[in-house]
Every structure is written in C-alpha cells, then in structure tokens.
Amino acid sequence: MAQGPLKKTKPSTAKRPTALAPKRGPRQIAPKKATLIKQQKITKKLTAGLTAKTERTLAQRAGHLELLAGGKKDKKAEKEKGKEKGGKKN
C-alpha cells in the first residue's frame, strides 16, 4: 500500500550535446630517423605536385565548359540583350 502522496515529476531540462566540436583525430608522431624524414619530405612534395596538377586540369575543364553554349557568359549576354530590347517604358 502507498505510504504517502506520489512525488511530482519535475520538467526535464533540454539536453546539451556532449560534443560541441568535431572530434579531434589521432595525432601523428613525426619520424625521428633521417631516412624516414627524407622519405616523408619527398612524399609531401610529390603529393603537392599531384594535387596541383589535378586542380589545374579541373580548372581547364571548367573553363572549357564555359566556352560551350549555356555557360555563364551566354546567360549574361542574354540578360543584357533583354534589357536593350525592352528599354524604358514611359
């Protein structure tokens, strides 16, 4: 049997997210041996060259797409033509 009145429930507070920022990844320990340091420098140089080359090719392809019909330049030209034809109406 119940001994006393039931406890009133308190309104729950809004839950705060435990992680406010993205979780940090594992830290990389720098190599100590001279051969490994040299190897790391070479790989860094090569990967930088590869990324630069891929970015350059992507930029060329994007530029080539603008030359085709329907690019940004064509849309701007069409807007200007529309303004010239319409003019001001009094």
UniProtKB/Swiss-Prot annotation:
<feature type="compositionally biased region" description="Basic and acidic residues">
    <location>
        <begin position="71"/>
        <end position="90"/>
    </location>
</feature>
<comment type="similarity">
    <text>Belongs to the UPF0390 family.</text>
</comment>
<dbReference type="InterPro" id="IPR019034">
    <property type="entry name" value="UPF0390"/>
</dbReference>
<dbReference type="Pfam" id="PF09495">
    <property type="entry name" value="DUF2462"/>
</dbReference>
<feature type="region of interest" description="Disordered">
    <location>
        <begin position="61"/>
        <end position="90"/>
    </location>
</feature>
<feature type="region of interest" description="Disordered">
    <location>
        <begin position="1"/>
        <end position="37"/>
    </location>
</feature>
<protein>
    <recommendedName>
        <fullName>UPF0390 protein AFUA_1G03640</fullName>
    </recommendedName>
</protein>
